[in-house]
Regions:
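A detector of single, family-specific signature residues
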Residues: 1-357
Length: 357
């Protein structure tokens, strides 16, 4: 580790994050490299980093690559210490071609991005109600996916089952199929193809039932948490628990990091991107941003198109003007994002509740 004494006030730190360790580079206010440090991803490692950085001078700001993944723990620690933390994008290829690729190089590029003012994104808070909702929703989605895989596997087993078993189960709905198969008694040591198939099908059916119970428990917690965190959001036309959860997660616990409704629209990928040149003035579709939040806005738009009179009037007007359904939905998503931002901006998401037993 190389250290350079300096009297420059204000230290900027850049951190390249990994699962088990982080690499940090410190710069002074003039952009001079002061030192490099590698720490484990533990509380003691974070404390060592803060002590090391403050040894050069007062720590002003930190640029971290991956504040929502490998850098989440360090981000929480630094924010609790009152340090300004910025989200830094992955280094651009042109920078890597010029300076090479290594952990210290990436960390230095992160620090210089903060020092130059090009890294201005504030990381999401990960210690409040929205983080609780996110963890539960991620688990629920994986359970829903696993349940779908289970029922598909059960039906595939039925296709290749012996004819007698197929005849017994043919024509049953999914719910009745799972209920009937879960009660099979093939014995502990299947001795023929039909018994082995029954054993396998019963195992899959019971897995489906366990996953359904797990999903119900998670949905109960999500309904409660979302209703407590954002009752005004759930009360909006076309917004349900899952849609509200998606939008809350996109904004984060600290929704004040979004400076205005245009920033929220850009985050959700519903803000048209200028694509003008010379006398040609045009915009192109934004295919970036948080795609899950974009999907949530799409669901709200579809619900309002079928049930909300104000939206139906707007759709009829734009259709008469010659717009296609896709174009109308894009406009609706932008308007809906504006409404939702106003609600999110009025929320106070800083007191994590306790999970119900």
């Amino acid at each position: 580790m190389r250290c350079i004494p300096t009297d420059a006030v204000g230290i900027t730190l850049g951190v390249d994050t990994h699962k088990d360790f982080h690499v940090a580079v410190a710069l002074d206010g003039l952009g001079r490299r002061l030192g490099t440090l590698s720490i484990p991803t533990t509380r003691s490692g974070y404390e060592k980093l803060a002590e090391w950085a403050n040894g050069f001078g007062p720590l002003e700001s930190v640029g971290i690559e991956g504040t929502g993944s490998f850098g989440a723990g360090l981000t929480r620690f630094l924010r609790s210490e009152g340090t300004r933390v910025f989200e830094v994008d992955r280094p651009k290829r042109r920078d890597q071609y010029r300076s090479g690729k290594s952990d210290p190089i990436d960390a230095e590029l992160a620090a210089r991005a903060v020092l130059a003012g090009t890294a201005t994104g504030r990381p999401k808070g990960a210690d409040g109600e929205v983080e609780m909702i996110r963890t539960l929703r991620v688990t629920r989605r994986s359970a829903v996916k696993a349940r779908a895989q289970a029922i598909n596997q059960l039906k595939n087993l039925l296709i290749t089952a012996p004819e007698g078993l197929r005849s017994e189960l043919r024509g049953l709905s999914t719910a009745k199929l799972v209920a009937k198969v879960s009660e099979f008694r093939p014995g502990t040591n299947p001795s023929d193809v039909e018994a082995a198939t029954k054993f396998a099908m019963r195992s899959v059916a019971r897995r489906h039932q366990r996953l359904s119970e797990e999903i119900s428990e998670l949905e109960e917690q999500l309904d409660r948490l979302v209703a407590e965190a954002a009752p005004e959001l759930v009360a909006m036309e076309g917004v349900g628990t899952d849609t509200a959860a998606s939008l809350l997660i996109a904004a984060g616990d600290n929704s004040e990091r979004l400076k205005d409704e245009a920033a929220f629209a850009h985050l959700c990928g519903v803000a048209p991107i200028p694509a003008s040149s010379g006398k040609s003035v045009r915009h192109r579709l934004n295919r970036h941003g948080n795609r899950d939040a974009n999907r949530a806005l799409y669901v709200v738009a579809l619900c309002r198109m079928s049930r909300d009179e104000r939206t139906r009037t707007y759709v009829a007007k734009r259709t008469a003007e010659g717009n296609t359904k896709k174009e109308i939905i894009r406009c609706l998503k932008r308007y809906i994002a504006r409404e939702i931002y106003r609600v999110l901006a009025s929320l106070s998401l800083n007191k994590p509740p306790i999970l119900a037993p």
